[in-house]
């Protein structure tokens, strides 16, 4: 088969044919039926967002999952193969706004006022379901075996009930809280965001020093001169219209510095440790006083935007606590001035300080990020656009001490990429801080792969976790199941559809749909006062959706049987038992603050448990230079492009073997091509085996391996040992979820052990005539090997493994798919570790011999006379001398602990001898040269050489001399790990004759290939060349005819009138003309 045919055979046509076969035979049902009584393996699929096409990262993720699941299935496990889809939230909403309804939606209010919530929600649902279909087909094309007809989707009512159940449990346990707090806020999406929904990027922002004039020092412990002021630093000028306080550190020293700023004299207060900033705002200054930070508490100042923001004047006049200095331990001496501008409506620490001293969480910024009427002069301006205007006003008022810019990391919305702001708003929270200790305990019980994924990275995230803001002011999501009484404020948290139906005064018409706007219309009757209760309009953070997947995907609480079977292991354990929950999950390392976290939080809140037992964390996909893939860089690789070009199996094997899963993958097209070549090597090995076996009508049942045991050669026994060692190695890797080790071990076996070693060794044996037992032994060994190899390969390259199984391995009543076979067990009777180690030495010796050939300019096809292998234990290689002779293409192999014909010699090191022996150095150097062999042998044997020169004792070691060796003429040496080879590289006339015969054979075989002849087709050959080559061909004519399948061989005997192919070859500057005629 040519290279073009090979690529086609291994590509789309083969894979689609195999996939059609799986579908027609209903492979999924048969696999599940086969394992119906096996042990449970609850695999939980982390749901990708149904918002686009798959990318390289999602492909890698699903391939890892599929490899693990296929392995577990072959081990007899009942694997839960349900795929999942994340269908709600901003990932979908933003796409619908931008791609579906872009003509109608410019901002959030357009959704309600122009489009309508009902239409918007319906479009979001359509969008999600459409992309579920698209991505399902793409995952199927990758060969992923899952129950694609029965996925869990977060938009299903049954799933939503699972989330509602968790919220009800949180309410019952006092872990659901409504509060006004500072939250991350996306002004474009107009909703709160959780900490794990904020992405940080480097941005450039203003960096300004602002003067806050002191108005009154009567309530402080300092007596300040006129024109005293606090100097503050900020990178968010837009927060100054909300300033209500300044914080200082109580225990740090502060200084009062007289300085001139823009022509006006000020007495500026800054922290002593940060007084270097004074040189930034003024050319010269003088320290006139100092005092501890606590002495400044109570100072009252006038905010710098006093005239521009009337609301600040109003608050200043109404509340004596406003615009004063307060002490706070969190004030840092790392940057700024030590005087921190505090806006309780815009910062978490500011907010807590305000709560402590009684300041209101004043926030003059609307949901869309523009200033409200309370923003005074800046009303209607978007906050970041207001920065420039505010800085300009401060400059005109003489209160801008210095302005610059700074590059720093700033939070952005994870979906629309807009810079966030911090706002004080009323939100709903899961009180994670109250169950944090329990969450940390569960982290210790989970098996993390790698270990540091949980015990370092994830643990650190949980230790610093704050209460989880779970409410969103959006539309397409799981509605917050909280109803509030219009009169008395009583709250009801609903945990299921049946509970909602039971408590509803009335239900909207049509089938229940637990989404907005249907659920918004459900009214309850207050059990406390009898008034109406209406639902709080928020929806849930989409991370709550996936966070409840371990039970919601099972239909719990509606379907308790599935929950008991999978989550509770057929009722053998309670929800908080260490064995309960999903057995295995795997996602990218960004999920330490995403899905791993949301599941743990929801699990502890709902069941006092972590809902997963084993976590494999994988990395990100980057380009070859380690850069993140992005459209702007033009380095995005579409996995479907790889599949189209090289096939799904190539992509699968590549991503599984390229690196340890927890490391970031640096995608390389060259490595993809290398992997495809390895698949070709596997295919060629299979084709070779199948072709010759069929030609000889070999039947493994008629010629079982056991019956041919006495005819097995060392290389046969070695391959039988290697395939069983491979079973152990691959099994161990899968058991530890180190799928990369399994993929790499298989890659090495296919490319090195099977193809480049064993088949190379036995190729001549398959050409033996008749039912020669040595040939039959090869076929039996290869059949045994492929029977095990295709099963080991099945989880990684399922299509090619299936094709080889069906076309070559399967026989009689064997299962109709390799994926219905059992995982192979180690066959100990064939395992021979000593033989494997010995063969490894032989391979290294052969590689060393090849290096000698290359250095000497002798081609591998040209035979050599002798090779000596110098090793510590020569006896262990005795049975493999013939193997080494064949591979190294030498007539004779000798073994020993030392090559007897080498002569060790010592070369003096003058730079070492001179300083030590001084005046005697010249005599020592001459002595070494005169007795080079004697000195060398003594040092090699005893580690030193002793003599007496001019009456002085001389002791020499390898420090003083360099020990080398002289070899007889014609010999070359090369070291390898474990020994050294010596090769006699001179060619005598007999060897040259044989070499020329081989060169001719090679050219005729290339011509057979060009004619696309089958193995059994016979030919006639004519050769014209010089006398030396002609004599060589004549001398080895039987060999030439046998190797080329030639009925006739004519050397310098005329030329045929008609030929099928004629070529003139240049070999070693000699001309060989060859004609081939296909026999009739």
UniProtKB/Swiss-Prot annotation:
Binding residues annotated for ATP, in chain numbering: 631
Enzyme Commission designation: 6.1.1.5
Residue window of motif 'KMSKS' region: 628-632
Chief place where the protein resides: cytoplasm
Top-tier EC class: ligase
Location in or out of the cell: Cytoplasm
Domain notes: IleRS has two distinct active sites: one for aminoacylation and one for editing. The misactivated valine is translocated from the active site to the editing site, which sterically excludes the correctly activated isoleucine. The single editing site contains two valyl binding pockets, one specific for each substrate (Val-AMP or Val-tRNA(Ile)).
Family: Belongs to the class-I aminoacyl-tRNA synthetase family. IleS type 2 subfamily.
Described function: Catalyzes the attachment of isoleucine to tRNA(Ile). As IleRS can inadvertently accommodate and process structurally similar amino acids such as valine, to avoid such errors it has two additional distinct tRNA(Ile)-dependent editing activities. One activity is designated as 'pretransfer' editing and involves the hydrolysis of activated Val-AMP. The other activity is designated 'posttransfer' editing and involves deacylation of mischarged Val-tRNA(Ile).
Descriptive protein name: Isoleucine--tRNA ligase
Native source species: Methanopyrus kandleri (strain AV19 / DSM 6324 / JCM 9639 / NBRC 100938)
High-level lineage: Archaea, Methanobacteriati, Methanobacteriota, Methanomada group, Methanopyri
